[in-house]
Amino acid sequence: MREPAFTVGIEEEYLLVDRQSRALAADPPEALMTRLAAAFGDTNHGAVTPEFLRAQIEVGTKVCDSLAEAGEALGALRRVLAEEAKGFGLAPIAASTHPFAEWADLKHTPKERYDLLAEDLQAVVRRLVICGMHVHVGIEDPDLRMDLMAQVSYFLPHLLALTTSSPFWRGEDSGLKSYRIAVFSALPRTGLPDSFSSFAEYQRHVEVLVSAGLIEDSTRIWWDIRPSHRFPTLEMRIADVCTRLDDALCVAALFRCLLRMLYRLRRANQRWRHYARLLIAENRWRAQRYGLDGGLVDFGRGEVVPFADLIEELLELIAPDAAVFGCQAEVLHARTILHRGTSAHNQLRVFAEARAGGMTRDEALVAVVDHLIAQTVAPLGADAGAPGP
């Protein structure tokens, strides 16, 4: 079997905020998308598209052969978006929830696909004021894609824990590091994927839903990981959007290296042990609730293991693959995330410090938005503040 290309592409969703009020821009001007289309058309880094809510926007990098190339593209997309939005009094924030937005105040983008979603899913989709990061890795063989999807699902909670950026919901500390997952889970066809023996079996299951008129195609299957409908890729979708660019590249590198590690096992007639969805879902919940703080269950040992220990084990597993891809620095950045916390940790820290400094609750929430605006466009290696966990 020929080794997959393992190309990489990254999609990120952002929220647009008003620079004066720091509230979500419920109805940004149409001219912004026109300007962005022109600005992005002048680069070869990727594309920008509207999202379900008018207050959201999505960027996607071009297909990249390395994490360095992906980082250059994603950094450029963030900068161009921020520069163009500033001309309209707006700013993007790479956070999976807004600290104090009210979903009932927002409008969805007038587009046939989104109109159908709004009609079908009603209040469930109107509450979807959330953003995620999707990482595509090129795996040309469709059956291999399905096999690796089943195996890498074990590691999805690890990736979620490293990306959490949604601790607040409607002005309150949700108590979860990723409240986005709680909101998104209200949609049908979400969560951990089923396992399939082949791509043909997967297609047969999808066709049942399509033939019954329930979905248009497999883009309406919103699992934490899925075979892409448009590209010969495996698409990781569990992640919150990372506020910091270096965190996003770390998680993309980890996902890519994990897939190659599992491919190496397959070439040696080995594979990662299959665990029931019940067990992986427990780790998914722990990542959603605690992020880096609570540890995950090692099912072989039958006990909760500190997340720092799990990351060291993971880094050892993928070391040969990081060397092949030349992304050692990106994967080792996981240790930095452990030290200073994810975006969720840092948002909570900024809020606590603002309150301790005498700010009102509303003022402290605005301070969190200011932190997110700055960190979204922070260059690689810039200081993120005090340690979080």
Swiss-Prot record:
Family recorded in the similarity comment: Belongs to the glutamate--cysteine ligase type 2 family. YbdK subfamily.
UniProt KW keywords: ATP-binding, Ligase, Nucleotide-binding
InterPro entries xrefs: GCL_type2/YbdK_subfam, GCS2, Gln_synth/guanido_kin_cat_dom, YbdK
NCBIfam families named among the record's database cross-references: gshA_cyan_rel, PRK13515.1
Protein name in the entry: Putative glutamate--cysteine ligase 2
Molecular functions (GO terms): ATP binding; glutamate-cysteine ligase activity
Taxon lineage: Bacteria, Pseudomonadati, Pseudomonadota, Alphaproteobacteria, Rhodospirillales
Catalytic activity of the protein: L-cysteine + L-glutamate + ATP = gamma-L-glutamyl-L-cysteine + ADP + phosphate + H(+)
Pfam families, sorted: GCS2
